[in-house]
Amino acid sequence: MSALPIATNHYFDTHFDRPGVKLLPNEFYTTSEDIVLMTVLGSCVAACLHDPVSGIGGMNHFMLPDDGADAGAAASESMRYGAYAMEVLINELIKAGGRRERFEAKVFGGAAVLAGMTTINIGDRNADFVRRYLALERIRITAEDLQGVHPRKVAFMPRTGRAMVKKLRLQVPGVAEREAALAREAVRASAARARAKVELFAAPRPSAPPPARPRIELFGARSGGAGVQPAVQKAASPYAANLSRK
């Protein structure tokens, strides 16, 4: 298998006044440095894991849940699937000194960005998957902002576990095109599974745990673009929400 798709887009974030790394779909990043990890999500999901004792944290960005991953595929292709993306993130954090039993999770994304795509439900499937996966791994979700119809911009500070989210306008350049491609991929994967005609015998999947109810603070964005306030809690500012550790 090829090298793991670690995010390489480094920059300096003027809003948070610290170095940052931008994650694209299928990428991940882990570190104990005082930086910010940033990504933009539609139906995709980003899981942010943090060990509050060691100060190590990381983020991934996956596009589809646990369907269709090929054990012989390149790592960059496998990372699009949640099962592989979560396994990589957890394992890399453990390699860096984190302890699984201390991990805390904050999860974002899973929006229904494309109108009329209710039959595929990529966002709902991704949201349900990440909740079930973390429940099975006994990793507590301390905050979440999942589903809905708006794309999100997520910032995560891996050293402290602080996470912030901003709801974006429905029509964000590049997001709609990516969502359309995801819908085509989901249809292709479904057709491939039907052709395989493999019957699996397994225990019923556990239902997803109830959504986390985090405390949310809001912060302003320098860009000045109006965001949509999360439905979890009303707040004064119309910008991004701070999902703090406590």
UniProtKB/Swiss-Prot annotation:
Entry annotated with the keyword 4Fe-4S: no
Reaction equation(s) it catalyzes: L-glutaminyl-[protein] + H2O = L-glutamyl-[protein] + NH4(+)
SUPFAM superfamilies: CNF1/YfiH-like putative cysteine hydrolases (SSF64438)
Top-level EC class: hydrolase
Function, in words: Probably deamidates glutamine residues to glutamate on methyl-accepting chemotaxis receptors (MCPs), playing an important role in chemotaxis.
Gene: cheD
MF terms (GO), sorted A to Z: protein-glutamine glutaminase activity
One Pfam match: CheD
Any single GO BP term: chemotaxis
Residues covered by region (Disordered): 225-246
Organism expressing this protein natively: Burkholderia vietnamiensis (strain G4 / LMG 22486) (Burkholderia cepacia (strain R1808))
The protein, known as: Probable chemoreceptor glutamine deamidase CheD
Recorded superkingdom: Bacteria
Its EC number(s): 3.5.1.44
Sequence similarity: Belongs to the CheD family.
PANTHER family: CHEMORECEPTOR GLUTAMINE DEAMIDASE CHED-RELATED (PTHR35147:SF2)
Coiled coil regions in record: none
Keyword annotations of the record: Chemotaxis, Hydrolase
